[in-house]
Structures are given as structure tokens and as C-alpha cells.
Amino acid sequence: MSQLSLSWLGLWPVAASPWLLLLLVGASWLLAHVLAWTYAFYDNCRRLRCFPQPPRRNWFWGHQGMVNPTEEGMRVLTQLVATYPQGFKVWMGPISPLLSLCHPDIIRSVINASAAIAPKDKFFYSFLEPWLGDGLLLSAGDKWSRHRRMLTPAFHFNILKPYMKIFNESVNIMHAKWQLLASEGSACLDMFEHISLMTLDSLQKCVFSFDSHCQEKPSEYIAAILELSALVSKRHHEILLHIDFLYYLTPDGQRFRRACRLVHDFTDAVIQERRRTLPSQGVDDFLQAKAKSKTLDFIDVLLLSKDEDGKKLSDEDIRAEADTFMFEGHDTTASGLSWVLYHLAKHPEYQERCRQEVQELLKDREPKEIEWDDLAHLPFLTMCMKESLRLHPPVPVISRHVTQDIVLPDGRVIPKGIICLISVFGTHHNPAVWPDPEVYDPFRFDPENIKERSPLAFIPFSAGPRNCIGQTFAMAEMKVVLALTLLRFRVLPDHTEPRRKPELVLRAEGGLWLRVEPLS
């Protein structure tokens, strides 16, 4: 009877073959997922209609190639921001919508959302994972929250103050090179090249208490970090190589793996050596020895950190955080310093005023070094730095993946699952936020002029719960380098105007070349 019923229903052949039944279940599962995805896609499209979009290049590619990582692309972005000052929708292919946000009122809802609601988008950061691991830059959820709480003491003023001596020493080494190169009166130098080495030199001393003399001779470790940064930037623009399997078959992929191994081996060796030292001395003796040298480096802080339950970081976690700090701390600071020197070269009247401010501060002091308490007494230099960071933010865009609907102040809704690009560059160049946004005007940051401005109008270090944990470190280093550079050198523009090139940080095509003249 059961056979007759199955036959009458047309299911007897299926019941007779478990493989056909399995195929039917699989096809049903696939169809259900396709239908669910299709419904979600069309629902998102409907809800995103309230966001304006520029004309697509074509139906398949969408807006891909409209804003290229070139000077021309930056100009297109500037025009888009002027046309759509609240932000706009773009399509990366036929089925991938993104929202580009460039106004403080709109950004606020996303950037101030918790790390669970608006985590960093993995697509834009995933290529860094084999190098940086699950550190603060790439981690999410409870792990990110725990590590953020544990690492915050590493950037307390009392930890940062002793680093001032390191900053002074590293910039002195760079300036000694410049004096030799400019022995005949002046020298034309690529600021990115020289300042990147200087920031890496400082970071190695602050993170590992290790002096590689990388500004004076080649260093394998430093060369590996520079190579990794270049390879990650290059991979972003090669769509097929986004697939890991294909990438690691290429010469670039193999170079990336070798450089990762070298960097990881160096960090692991320092951690293991420090772990051997710590038990033999005990925590109290270890801290007393460090107090005599007046410097507690980043590895020390990580090794001693405990969470609320008394748990420490694993060696893998410490390596990830140290490698992340080395990556995030060198390129961003080098970019910020290079562009502010460019602006001061273009505006000699501001350069001279900064120089006089530094000379007045250090007039009765030998040696001429910048100390922690000096940082608050360089107001005009700080204004010049901030205006440069506005025009040329080191990190031009931040991505967030929205995990639940976010309601904007004007009532529009960003649907769950959408990637939001918080355009730092766009916000800083938005004429609805900044009058004459392309003009370099340090007085925008005069204390009287910032009172009525949204705090999210200026976000070079991001904002909200996932803002840059190292921004005080970065600003301190930048002030030391800029003050001593202007004290010793006159900076002049090169004959060719730099062309902006956004990669992992905002660079200049072929380097950012300026002429330096020793003042004495």
C-alpha cells in the first residue's frame, strides 16, 4: 500500500534512491538560500533608494573605476562630495551596494555605534590578517573590547613621557643625514622615504627597546615591514589576486609569506627573551629595573597586562598587538609629517611663524630638545599640523559593516548588512562643513573658530569607540619632529606639484619631494 501511495505521488523513484533524496534536499536548501538572498537584496535595494547615487559607468561594473587611487580619482571624489554633501550610494558590480558617508551628522550614527553593531569590514582589512593577526585593528566583538581595555594603559601619559627622548634621538639621526646631504647648500629629499625610516626607528625602540640603526644601515626587519605594506597596497588593485590560493602562487604572494615569517620571528624572539627575563627577576624587580631606565616599552606593558579576571595576553596576542602597532604607527605618522612639511614649504609665512614659536620656546635651553611639557606650548604649530591633517588625512577612508539597521537623524535607515565607507577625506573636503575646503588655513583651528564646529568634522584619527588608540603618541611624535625640523632647516617646495595617491595611507606618486636648507 505504501509503495502504491509513493508511486501515485510520483516519489517512489526518489524513495528508492537515497542519492536522489539527498540531491532533492540539497537542491531545496540551495533554492531556499537563493530565494532568501534575492529577497534580502531587493529589500535592501528598496530601502537604499532614499540615498542618492551618481550615474553608473554601466549596469555590470556599476561605479567601479569612477574614483581611482590617483590624483584624478581624488578630484572626482571632491566633486562627488560637493554634489552629494550628505553622502551617496555606489555599486561595486551589479549586486554590491556601498554607502559613502561624508557629513558629520550622518557619520555620527555609524561611527559612534558600538563595535558589535558597526565592526570594521573584513573585506577592506583581510589582506593584513596573515601579518597582523587578531590585533586591535582586525579583531571584533568581545576580544576587541577586552584587548582595548588592556592596552589603554600602554598609552597613558606616564608611559608616553619617556618616549620623548627616543623621538628626539631619532629625529637627530635623520637631521644629521640631511646636514650631510645638504652640505652644498640644499638637498632635494623624498620626505616619505626619510620620515618612514625615522618613525620605524622610533617605533622599534618604543615597542621592543631595540636599536637596529635602520636610519644608518639596512635592516632586514625594517625592510620586511616596508615590503609588506607595499605588497598589501598592490594586492588591493589586482582583483583576481584577492583569492588567497591564487595570490600565494605568485611571486608577490611568496614574498609576502617570507616577509611575514621574518617579522613574526623577530617579534616572537623578543617576546620569548622578555618572558625568560620576567620570571627570573619577578614582576616587582622587573618594574624597578625598568624604572631606573625610565622607559617601559610596549612589550613590557603587554606582558604585564591583565584583564578584570586576572588573565594575561597569550604570546600570539602580544605578537599581534606589537605587529599592529609597528604597522599603524609608521606609515600614518610619516604621511602626516610629509604633508604638513609640504604645506609649510608652500606657505613660508606660516613656516616662519612656527619657527619663531619653537625658537622662543627653546631660546635658553641646551641641548635643543622638545620635552613633554613643551607640547602644550606650540599652539600655532599644532594648528598648522591639524589643518594639514584635514587636507591630507593619512587614512582617507574607514569601512564599517553594519550588523543591524541604523536609523539616521533625518529618518533614513541604513539596512543591516550594508558596508559603509566613512570618507575621512570627503568629510574634511566637504564645502557644507568647511568653507573654501581646498584652501590651507591653519586659523580654522584657532580655539575661537572650533567652538561651533561638530567634533566629527575633523576625524584624522577616526572617532567613537574604535578611534585610534595611539593618537596621543602620534601627535607627540609629530610635534617633536616638526618643531626640531623647522628649528634646523628651511623647507622649500620642489618644482613639481605632488600627485596624491591613496593606498593604505595617503601618499604621493613617486614620493613627496621637498628641498631642505640648513639654517646654521
From Swiss-Prot:
What does the record say about its membrane topology?
Peripheral membrane protein
Cellular compartments annotated? Microsome membrane; Endoplasmic reticulum membrane
- SUPFAM superfamilies per record: Cytochrome P450
Which keywords does this Swiss-Prot/TrEMBL entry list?
A: Endoplasmic reticulum, Fatty acid metabolism, Heme, Iron, Lipid metabolism, Membrane, Metal-binding, Microsome, Monooxygenase, Oxidoreductase
Q: Which reaction does it catalyse?
A: an organic molecule + reduced [NADPH--hemoprotein reductase] + O2 = an alcohol + oxidized [NADPH--hemoprotein reductase] + H2O + H(+); (5Z,8Z,11Z,14Z)-eicosatetraenoate + reduced [NADPH--hemoprotein reductase] + O2 = 20-hydroxy-(5Z,8Z,11Z,14Z)-eicosatetraenoate + oxidized [NADPH--hemoprotein reductase] + H2O + H(+); (5Z,8Z,11Z)-eicosatrienoate + reduced [NADPH--hemoprotein reductase] + O2 = 20-hydroxy-(5Z,8Z,11Z)-eicosatrienoate + oxidized [NADPH--hemoprotein reductase] + H2O + H(+); (5Z,8Z,11Z,14Z,17Z)-eicosapentaenoate + reduced [NADPH--hemoprotein reductase] + O2 = 20-hydroxy-(5Z,8Z,11Z,14Z,17Z)-eicosapentaenoate + oxidized [NADPH--hemoprotein reductase] + H2O + H(+)
Enzyme class comes to oxidoreductase
Instruction: Tell me which Pfam families the record gives.
Output: p450
Report the protein's function. A cytochrome P450 monooxygenase involved in the metabolism of various endogenous substrates, including fatty acids, eicosanoids and vitamins. Mechanistically, uses molecular oxygen inserting one oxygen atom into a substrate, and reducing the second into a water molecule, with two electrons provided by NADPH via cytochrome P450 reductase (CPR; NADPH-ferrihemoprotein reductase). Catalyzes predominantly the oxidation of the terminal carbon (omega-oxidation) of long- and very long-chain fatty acids. Displays high omega-hydroxylase activity toward polyunsaturated fatty acids (PUFAs).
Q: Could you identify this protein by its name?
A: Cytochrome P450 4F2
Please tell me the species this chain comes from: Homo sapiens
